[in-house]
């Protein structure tokens, strides 16, 4: 197995939370049902940092695949996992097609938040396609 790509993204939690408050439809556009299931989203003080980290994970996934993916929806990348569990990426649609065409067989995700920032790091591996 070979590392095919690495992506990282960082999000300012307060700025991201303000954007969600200003534009209520943004939350539905960026996040699907899997993204919004975790218990930590029920606590208002944790929801902003959790959603910011999930958005960073989506951006990091796109970067790990090389970016420039046309015909994708933000719902094509969803993050699963409850507090204390290893988060996982669920791919579908255009992003899943791009991953398959690139030879991706597994993804690895790490997310964190501190000091008002949320960060996500994604590694994709598999067998390169020619």
Segments from the language model and where they lie:
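Core catalytic alpha/beta fold that binds nucleotide/phospho-ligands
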Residues: 1-130
